[in-house]
């Protein structure tokens, strides 16, 4: 199995277009080797020829330009991307679909909830149904794409930002709002969870002893953006666990015996993005990698 991290940042990327916090300043200046990051998405392949795109980032075109494996290979029109799978209806997971409207054949897979959101917004009709088939999937039921078995499962989260005003106060929404994904090629198994609000017993059992897990790294601490003065929202309010703290990711994974752990979907305010920070040192000491655009893992 081949996995390419196309984007590793949370919504808005790093640096976010209007952000001047310390972490973002370093990225603007590319000081001390600071890396800029696009919004989170990965591509996976069993053979290096046919690829499944996991979430369609607003930075889709930039990510393709940076990834030769996904360039057109033959004919006048071609893409190695044969399927797209969405783990939520968040803007940073669906907006890239609008950059895939040029009459290129691929299959689109999502929960019924997310497909309904797309159907309700006529802008997504730009995806010509003659070329793009939309397929709802069932939770905890494997589907086979490009010789990979992909199993979506529910994790704690919330409704997309643009649906909050229509949620009636139920921000958690249905069990199809926020999903994780298990990817299996018959020899190796990977878990991709770019958004998660809490570690549950079911999730703990699923991840215990895993070979590779990509996990929500949005914020270092729950009140990070509040303390910086850039937002009144906590991580929990946004549907994300924080890395630090007694209920945080480092503590939750401490006994799970995961062979390789990678933080992804990292907010532009998060100090772990600074490779010289004590927070970055702490996650590295706990056995975590911090994803960056272009990271490639072969299993």
From Swiss-Prot:
Keywords: PQQ biosynthesis, Transport. Pathway: Cofactor biosynthesis; pyrroloquinoline quinone biosynthesis. InterPro entries: Metallo-B-lactamas, PQQ_synth_PqqB, RibonucZ/Hydroxyglut_hydro. SUPFAM superfamilies: Metallo-hydrolase/oxidoreductase. Gene3D superfamilies: Ribonuclease Z/Hydroxyacylglutathione hydrolase-like (3.60.15.10). CDD domains: PQQB-like_MBL-fold. One of its GO terms (biological process) is pyrroloquinoline quinone biosynthetic process. Belongs to the PqqB family. HAMAP family: PQQ_syn_PqqB. May be involved in the transport of PQQ or its precursor to the periplasm. This is Coenzyme PQQ synthesis protein B. The gene is pqqB.
């Amino acid at each position: 199995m081949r996995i390419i991290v196309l984007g590793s940042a949370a919504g808005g990327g790093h640096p976010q277009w209007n952000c001047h916090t310390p972490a973002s300043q370093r990225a603007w200046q590319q000081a001390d080797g600071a890396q800029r990051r696009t919004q989170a998405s990965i591509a996976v392949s069993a053979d290096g020829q046919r690829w499944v795109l996991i979430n369609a980032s607003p930075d889709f075109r930039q990510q393709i330009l940076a990834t030769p494996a996904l360039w057109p290979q033959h004919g006048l029109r071609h893409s190695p991307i044969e399927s797209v799978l969405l783990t939520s209806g968040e803007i940073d997971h669906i907006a890239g679909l609008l950059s895939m409207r040029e009459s290129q054949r691929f299959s689109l897979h999502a929960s019924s909830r997310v497909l309904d959101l797309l159907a309700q917004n006529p802008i997504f009709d730009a995806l010509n149904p003659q070329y793009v088939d939309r397929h709802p999937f069932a939770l905890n039921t494997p589907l086979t794409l490009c010789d990979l078995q992909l199993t979506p499962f529910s994790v704690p989260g919330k409704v997309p930002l643009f649906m909050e005003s229509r949620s009636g106060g139920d921000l958690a929404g249905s069990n199809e709002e926020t999903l994780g994904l298990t990817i299996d090629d018959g020899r190796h198994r990977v878990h991709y969870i770019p958004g998660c609000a809490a570690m549950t017993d079911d999730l703990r059992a699923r991840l215990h002893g895993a070979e590779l897990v990509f996990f929500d790294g949005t914020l270092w601490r729950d009140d990070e953006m509040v303390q910086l003065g850039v937002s009144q929202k906590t991580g929990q309010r946004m549907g994300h666990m924080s890395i630090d703290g007694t209920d945080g990711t480092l503590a939750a994974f401490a006994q799970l015996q995961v062979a390789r752990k990678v933080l992804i979907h990292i907010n532009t305010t998060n100090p772990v993005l600074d490779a010289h920070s004590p927070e970055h040192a702490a996650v590295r000491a706990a056995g975590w990698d911090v994803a960056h655009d272009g990271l490639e893992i072969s299993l």
